[in-house]
């Protein structure tokens, strides 16, 4: 299996961001807060929100193809349970293999689940971000704090440290 990252962008200027929401509570808010920072402070272009059918399985092929066609980079969140953290990491690997730089976000309580899925997918060194647990029960202000904390790692994983 291919464990090569897709080519990294030189900058985010004008790039379309795909946000893949896995339907877990606060996933949309976390993704949108990160996208807002990438747009306002790093020149990223439009952010497009997509929603998976079910959090516990990898993204459907049809939706994967749509996002690959429409976006330059992808951020997917939030893996804050066993099956959804594994699926979030699997999604990131699928996008990388399709040629789209991706950041998968799990919670730190499920870091090992994400790492195990990366190994199962033949990509044991796959780099993803583990946000502080919990996510689902947080207020909007707390989600914003989590997004700001995640930002340097999101940039690093995308290869455009800012």
Functional labels for PLM-detected ranges:
Residues 60-72, 91:
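Short, well-structured alpha-helical segments in soluble
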Residues 10, 15-36, 45:
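Glycine-rich phosphate/diphosphate-binding loop of Rossmann-like nucleotide-binding domains
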Residues 131-162:
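A charged, well-structured terminal subsegment
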Residues 1-13:
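Short N-terminal or domain-adjacent regulatory/targeting segments
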Residues 54-65, 143-144:
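Structural motif
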Residues 89-112, 129:
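Short, acidic/small-residue loops that bind anionic groups at enzyme active sites
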Residues 40-53, 125-132:
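Short beta-strand elements in bilobed, periplasmic/extracellular small-molecule ligand-binding domains
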